[in-house]
């Protein structure tokens, strides 16, 4: 929670609230929380956890299909905005790239992901852990691994170690390029792993 840097000035977009344990804590700190959840089974549990919380709204939709610029303009006028997310490994890159590549008016993106994905998100260009996603993240933001969480920190315990990465969005990209999609897209070598 502290890793997000959120306080009462902030509007927060939360991706993947689950049953709302983190959501409730975010709502205590932020001016408003809008959570985006794709799993249609979770709203009843989330409603129970968030009962009595008036600065919370749920959007039941796939985050990759949400018009986030419109959502931010409608829900957070005049507020700084932070994104907090607990992302499954298989969808980490598409979501991070949507959030960064769409140049949304957000100040930061704080994600909990599988440790291996966190290593790549936070890797400095040219290091052993760097990859196409590392390059893209460093183009749009500065990133820092905040902490790791052992499987026993959760119930039920996953089979992997997780980590939190905070990305602070750059006001302008790190370098000027004519085609940022070409610059931030993986090369054939990155895709094949050779």
Q: PLM features: residue spans?
A:
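Single conserved hydrophobic/aromatic residue that forms the stacking wall/gate
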Residues: 183-194
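Catalytic cores of RNA-modifying enzymes
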Residues: 1-181
């Amino acid at each position: 929670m502290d890793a997000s840097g959120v306080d009462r000035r902030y509007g927060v977009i939360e991706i993947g609230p689950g049953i709302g344990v983190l959501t409730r804590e975010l709502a205590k700190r932020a001016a408003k929380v809008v959570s985006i959840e794709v799993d249609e089974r979770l709203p009843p549990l989330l409603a129970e956890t968030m009962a009595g919380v008036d600065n919370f709204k749920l959007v039941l939709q796939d985050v990759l299909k949400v018009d986030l610029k419109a959502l931010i303009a409608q829900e957070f006028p005049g507020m700084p905005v932070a994104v907090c997310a607990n992302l499954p490994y298989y969808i980490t890159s598409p979501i991070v790239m949507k959030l960064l590549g769409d140049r949304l008016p957000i100040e930061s993106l704080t994600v909990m992901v599988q440790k291996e994905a966190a290593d790549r998100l936070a890797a400095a260009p040219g290091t052993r852990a760097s990859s196409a996603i590392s390059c893209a993240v460093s183009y749009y933001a500065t990133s820092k691994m905040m902490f790791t969480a052992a499987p026993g920190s959760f119930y039920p315990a996953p089979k992997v170690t997780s980590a939190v990465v905070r990305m602070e969005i750059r006001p302008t990209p790190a370098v000027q390029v004519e085609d940022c999609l070409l610059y931030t897209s993986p090369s054939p070598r990155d895709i094949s792993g050779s």
